Amino acid sequence: KKFDHTVDPSTLPVEEKGGAVVFSKDENGIVRFAMVHDVFGYWTLSKGGIDLGESPEEGTIREIKEEIGLDITIVEKLGENEYVAHHPEKGKIRKHVHYFLTESVYQPLVLAAGTGGLDQAKWFELSEIPELMMYDDVTKLIAGAIEKITMLTAAH
């Protein structure tokens, strides 16, 4: 039997992250999503590390403010996701991401300097979302978010 060199993920150090599907609904009822563009050419969700002593919600609110300059309100949790990544110092680590559906005022996005791996932040209308190049997990999260927003906005 060949020796298995794959690492058992449960033994790896965990990095907690918070991410958000950020939507805005303007006075005309137009729903838009705030997305960030990464250096690999994909539109993705703004996310960042949760500090020690912060709840996933608090960390996500702080990170979105730092990364794209928006004050967000958490509507509900969308789910969690975990993947193994390579850290320059620690080697292999588990990244555990908490995703939230969040709402914000429609205002210009300001991508912070030094947000590693990101080169753009932009709002997209609902109709533009299917055209975007996105990761599968992001597509699923946005699809779930759209369903929830449709239900929320129908109620008002």
Where are these regions (language model features)?
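Acidic, metal-coordinating catalytic segment for phosphate/diphosphate chemistry
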Residues: 1-28
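Short connector loops at helix/strand junctions that flank enzyme active sites
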Residues: 15-18, 40, 94-97
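Conserved beta-strand and immediately adjacent loop positions that scaffold enzyme active sites
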Residues: 19, 32, 120
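Short, solvent-exposed loop/turn segments that connect beta-strands within catalytic domains
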Residues: 26-32, 89-92
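Short, acidic/hydrophobic/Gly-rich beta-strand patch recurrent on exposed beta strands
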Residues: 34-37
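A short gly/proline-enriched turn/hairpin at secondary-structure junctions
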Residues: 44-47
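Unchanged
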Residues: 50-140
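Charged phosphate-binding loop/patch that engages nucleotide di/tri-phosphates or the phosphate backbone
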Residues: 131-156
